[in-house]
Design a protein with these regions (language model features):
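TRAFAC-class small GTPase G-domain
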Residues: 1-202
Length: 202
């Protein structure tokens, strides 16, 4: 079975390692959010077979947490050969959101054209209006700032396992929540792009 290389990328303390362990534990019946956090000292790698709506898919998942400040060449090495990138930022930290274009430009330079899921984590720290504003600003600015055609923005909470969805009115403050592994929406987006089919995790 062919595997797809998926890289978790972006600022530190944004949820990359938590997502890594969540994907690793997909076969378990329960997943409990661990409030304890330990920054990753070096990259983690795993090959995992996951069940999806189009059959089993093998992914090579790379977690680069802890390497954010160790130089561009090292980060380039992690990105090389990637089939897709999940770029994390912290929606409760303006600086983290401001760093998105820099990370995206590195992705564009090293692996041009790969699909990128930009994932704003920790939405549980925001009120409803702030959540809507975050969705709006990111959707307006991402492609303009970077010029990358295969970017999709998602607002999630790994802690609450939710994906926040803005309704049909772009400027409305009304939002809904997708639960039951909603925080894995970014991975579903990448796999759907890579397999030219709508992919849902089983």
């Amino acid at each position: 079975m062919d595997s797809k290389k998926i890289v978790l990328f972006g600022d530190g303390c944004t949820g990359k390692s938590t997502m890594y362990h969540k994907i690793r534990d997909l076969k378990k019946e329960d997943y409990t959010f661990d409030k304890r956090y330990k920054a990753t000292d070096e990259f983690d790698f795993m090959r995992v077979e996951i069940k999806t709506s189009i059959g089993d898919i093998m992914i090579d998942l790379w977690d680069t947490a802890g390497q954010e400040n160790r130089g561009g060449k090292l980060r380039d090495a992690y990105l090389k050969g990637a089939d897709g990138v999940i770029l994390f930022y912290d929606v409760s930290e303006k600086k983290s959101a401001a760093n998105i274009p820099e990370w995206l430009n590195q992705v564009k330079r090293v692996v041009p054209g790969v699909p990128v899921a930009v994932v704003g984590n920790k939405s549980d720290k925001l009120n409803e209006l702030d959540q809507c504003e975050s969705v709006k600003l990111r959707e307006c600015n991402l492609q303009r700032d970077v010029g990358h055609s295969q970017i999709k923005n998602f607002l999630i909470s790994i802690k609450n396992d939710t994906h926040i969805v803005s309704n049909s009115s772009f400027w409305s403050s009304k939002i809904t929540y997708e639960v039951e592994r909603g925080c894995l929406i970014g991975l579903e987006y990448l796999l759907s792009n890579l397999y030219n089919n709508t992919v849902k995790l089983a």
